[in-house]
UniProtKB/Swiss-Prot annotation:
Name of this chain's protein: ATP-dependent protease subunit HslV
Biological function: Protease subunit of a proteasome-like degradation complex believed to be a general protein degrading machinery.
Catalytic activity: ATP-dependent cleavage of peptide bonds with broad specificity
Single annotated GO MF: metal ion binding
Pfam families assigned to the protein according to its UniProt record, in alphabetical order: Proteasome
Residues passing through the membrane, by range: none
Activity modulation comment: Allosterically activated by HslU binding.
Hydrolase as UniProt keyword: yes
Keywords: Allosteric enzyme, Cytoplasm, Hydrolase, Metal-binding, Protease, Sodium, Stress response, Threonine protease
Active site: T2
InterPro entries referenced in this protein's UniProt entry, alphabetically: ATP-dep_Prtase_HsIV_su, Ntn_hydrolases_N, Proteasome_sua/b, Proteasome_suB-type
Compartments in which it is found: Cytoplasm
């Protein structure tokens, strides 16, 4: 799996991910980029799960963003509906973390679109470790969103065997 973390603080939203790709119990690649910009660089997104599945979902999500003129929540709900009801899409195994200047969302194949209360997202095998670290840093420091994401990913990379310390980080300022 992987670790994807998103933090929103002081006019910045950041999504970061590690770079490890595994096949069974073998590391196949250590520098995969699981976070990217979409819709004219106005949306950032990260994935946990199957790489090919995630690329398919990124393409579909970008189409939904274009259909809904960049409205993140509408595009996310439409993607989740298609993902849940389409026979072929239902087989895709991934989770998406997406964010723009207004919202941070988790999109699942079960048709769920979740906006966390504190705008903190952590998904993938290292998600619980990264979430714990990020929450502690949010509550007890004045660190910026990017620093919190970097430190949370590093901690998850030290603990989770399916997460490494290579990081891809994207940030939006609003």
């Amino acid at each position: 799996m992987t670790t994807i973390v998103s933090v929103r603080r002081n006019g910045h939203v950041v999504i970061g991910g590690d770079g490890q790709v595994t096949l069974g119990n073998t590391v196949m690649k250590g520098n995969a980029k699981k976070v990217r910009r979409l819709y004219n660089n106005k949306v950032i997104a990260g994935f946990a799960g199957g790489t090919a599945d995630a690329f398919t979902l990124f393409e579909l999500f970008e189409r939904k963003l274009e259909m809904h003129q960049g409205h993140l929540t509408k595009a996310a709900v439409e993607l989740a509906k298609d993902w849940r009801t389409d026979r072929m899409l239902r087989k895709l195994e991934a989770l998406l973390a997406v964010a723009d200047e207004t919202a941070s969302l988790i999109i699942t194949g079960n048709g769920d679109v979740v906006q966390p209360e504190d705008d903190l997202i952590a998904i993938g095998s290292g998600g619980p470790y990264a979430q714990s670290a990020a929450r502690a840093l949010l509550e007890n420091t004045e660190l910026g969103a990017r620093d919190i994401v970097e430190k949370s990913l590093s901690i998850a990379g030290d603990i989770c065997i399916y997460t490494n310390r290579f990081q891809t980080i994207e940030e939006l300022t609003y």
